[in-house]
Amino acid sequence: PFGTNLIFDCGNIENFTFAIEICEDLWVPNPPSTNHALAGANVILNLSASDEITGKADYRRKLVEMQSAKNICAYIYSSTDLVFAGHNIIAENGTMVAQSKRFESSNITYGDIDLDKIATERQRMTTFYVNPDNEDYMNVSVKLKNKEVKVDRYIDKAPFVPSDTNKRNARCEEILEIQTWGLRRRLEHTGCSNAVIGISGGLDSTLALLVTVKAFDALRLDRK
């Protein structure tokens, strides 16, 4: 079969279905990969010939990451190296898994993709439950060699705590602001102007105290 409505189902590899879009498809307002994802593809392959101009690599990288995030999928982008940059990118649900160096005549880019994670994330989204356009797609059964290999991907034991100090501080500040805003709205809604907190000396009660202080300051309430 030939067309833009093909989903390739690898029956011998669990949760592995892929679809293909070509080059500029990714850059248009409504990329075909969005329909592919809604039709069940969890890996998108893009065979590209992207020309190189100053600043385009960063834009391309963000575009691939964002498309993989929107569609909760893995996105594999490969660009020719003949007269272009040869920029290869693998992104999974908004996260960069691997990318090649540009302007190299010969390179292979590979990375580990967590298909089970993608399937789990999609189960949380009602968007992927019912899609009337699925009937326009044709499922093509394929088989790939499925051999045991070592995991090459680094798995962070603390995935929600950034290793970079600046990013970690920014993340903590964001969490504090979210909790502060939530408490502030609740105090405004109930008309409450005082709070009683049991301080044990542990982290939880300390955080509760800090959030309460910030919320009271934001509302210009007396801390006492």
Where are the regions that the model predicts?
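Active-site-adjacent bridging/hinge elements
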Residues: 42-44, 150-159, 179, 187
